[in-house]
Amino acid sequence: MTTRIVVAQILGAHGVHGRVKLKSFTADETAVFGYAPLTDESGRREFKLRRTGTGKDHFLAEVDGITGKEAADALRGTRLYIERDRLPAPEDEDEFYHADLIGLDTVTADDQPFGTIKAIYDFGAGDMLEIRHVSEKTVFLPFTKACVPVIEIAAGRVVVEPPANFFAPAGPQPAEGEEMPDGALEALEGEEAGAGTAPQP
């Protein structure tokens, strides 16, 4: 049975004429426009794309058969797949496609579940893994050897080591028994909600 991997995701509509915003997960991000056929997760619906422009961290594209904003909006969140054997094999056994990581479970060094990899982004300072944490929060982890020391594609397992205080709220904490000043609790909650996360692209 051939393995299918996700190579792109439709982020939503762009404008009123049916164009979409597209996030590519391939190492050469433009290569996704040369792959065919692209299908949805079920494999039953095919998509033909034509690149029309570039946005911030995404491409703009036309999809065959999509001519209006409503139809384009209906595709929001759709992930596009390709048969794994249509991609050239990595030259080294330790190499892999970024797309191979999408959907893999992550665990900590002591084998505790951490979350599921949803996407890989480059925000300008290196690749980041978007992970749906077991707490149901979305977190972003630097895709470095220090933070991601073990990747086992065949086993579907990735070991992560988040930086120290990854989930700790920023700012000073009150001493035990000390009350927080007015407004500090709301500010702290806002900081905590953003700890270890980044805005959705």
Swiss-Prot record:
One GO cellular component, as annotated: cytoplasm
Keyword Lipid metabolism carried by entry: no
Gene Ontology terms for molecular function: ribosome binding
All copies of domain PRC barrel, residue ranges: 92-166
Residue spans crossing the bilayer: none
Domain of life: Bacteria
Location of the protein in the cell: Cytoplasm
One BP term from GO: ribosomal small subunit biogenesis
Sorted UniProt keywords: Chaperone, Cytoplasm, Ribosome biogenesis, rRNA processing
Covalent S-S links between cysteines: none
Keyword Ion transport: no
Region Disordered, annotated ranges: 169-201
SUPFAM superfamilies: PRC-barrel domain (SSF50346), Translation proteins (SSF50447)
The protein's role, per its UniProt record: An accessory protein needed during the final step in the assembly of 30S ribosomal subunit, possibly for assembly of the head region. Essential for efficient processing of 16S rRNA. May be needed both before and after RbfA during the maturation of 16S rRNA. It has affinity for free ribosomal 30S subunits but not for 70S ribosomes.
Family in the record: Belongs to the RimM family.
Record note on domains: The PRC barrel domain binds ribosomal protein uS19.
Xref: HAMAP family: Ribosome_mat_RimM
Cross-referenced NCBIfam families: 16S_RimM (TIGR02273)
Quaternary state and interactors: Binds ribosomal protein uS19.
Protein name, as recorded: Ribosome maturation factor RimM
Organism: Rhodospirillum centenum (strain ATCC 51521 / SW)
